[in-house]
Amino acid sequence: RTLDDAIDGADLFMGLSGPGVLTQDMVKKMADKPLILAMANPTPEIMPELAKAVRPDAILATGRSDYPNQVNNVLCFPFIFRGALDCGASTINEEMKKACVKAIADLAMKEATDVVAEAYAGEELTFGPEYLIPKPFDARLIEEVPVAVVKAAMESGVATRPIEDLEAYRKSLHEFVNAAGLFMQPMIEAAKQGPK
């Protein structure tokens, strides 16, 4: 069976291969409102504008910063490690990974802060087809994801240094946001100038 056969009526395409694998003809055959996750970098399996040209109802995500819904491991890795290190997790288990993903998903549904709106001026920041996941420079990630990871580590029994007061822990993480602000601002400005 080929991809062309398998894609007929599919709700989802998850690409982790190479450029040009998914064609416009294939996209036409997908189910209503297909979710197309074209993750090959730097050139995805299909460019978003090509998919949208034949399927305006398609919901797309790529690994590229110059398109909506950039899927980037920077959304999870620093924060899952922060939580794991802070509670002395003996391993990073499935519960912690799920907690990380859920915290990121929940954050996408919250209203963007003024800081995020300023960093991504002119971009859609309300949950929907063009904004499924938070932006990489959303400072709320450091306040939400590690707390969820720590909680999951404690509940699953892998935290060797449980954190009693999660709200105090959350507040301590906020200090990283302020400390990182001066460091991150030049990168945010550069990203605005040349988003590729």
What are these regions, as identified by a protein language model?
Residues 163-190:
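Long, charged amphipathic helices and adjacent flexible linkers at domain junctions
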Residues 1-29:
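A structured beta-alpha segment of the ubiquitous adenosine-cofactor-binding alpha/beta core
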Residues 27-33, 52-55:
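Short, conserved loop/helix-junction motifs that constitute active-site signature segments
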Residues 1, 20-23, 46-47, 62-63, ...:
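Glycine-rich, charged/polar anion/phosphate-binding loops
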Residues 38-146, 150-157, 161:
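Adenosine-phosphate binding glycine-rich loop
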Residues 10, 33-34, 57-58:
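Short, well-ordered alpha-helix to beta-strand connector turns
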